[in-house]
C-alpha cells in the first residue's frame, strides 16, 4: 500500500477559502487547498468577500490580475506573486504595503485606505496609480 501526499497551501481565513471554493478551486472548507489547483490561476476577483487574512495568496504563483477591493485587509504579502500586473486593493484598511518585489506591476488601485506612504520606486512598469 502506498500513500500519495499532495502539496497543500494553508488558507486560515474562512472567507478567503470560501471564495476560492466558490470559484471552483477548492471543495472543502478545511484551511487548505491543493496547491496544484491554484498555482496556475491567472486572475482572482475577490471583491467584498469580508477577507481579513490573505495567508495562502503565495500559492497563486502565476497570478497576473488580483482584485481585493472592498475587504478588511490591513496586510498582504504579495512578494511571491512576482508576475502580478494589475492589482486593486481599494477600500481596505492598509496603512502601508510593500510592492517592491512586484516589478512587473502595471496598474495599482489603492484608494480608500489609510496609507501614509507608498514606495513604488521599484515598480518601473507602473503606468496607472
What is the meaning of each model-derived region?
Residues 1-65, 80-82, 103, 122-124:
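N-terminal capping/linker segments that flank leucine-rich repeat
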Residues 41, 63, 73, 84, ...:
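Conserved hydrophobic position(s) of the canonical leucine-rich repeat
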Residues 41-46, 66-68, 85-89, 106-110, ...:
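Conserved hydrophobic beta-strand positions in leucine-rich repeat
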Residues 54-58, 73-79, 94-100, 115-121:
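The feature encodes a structural signal of leucine-rich repeats
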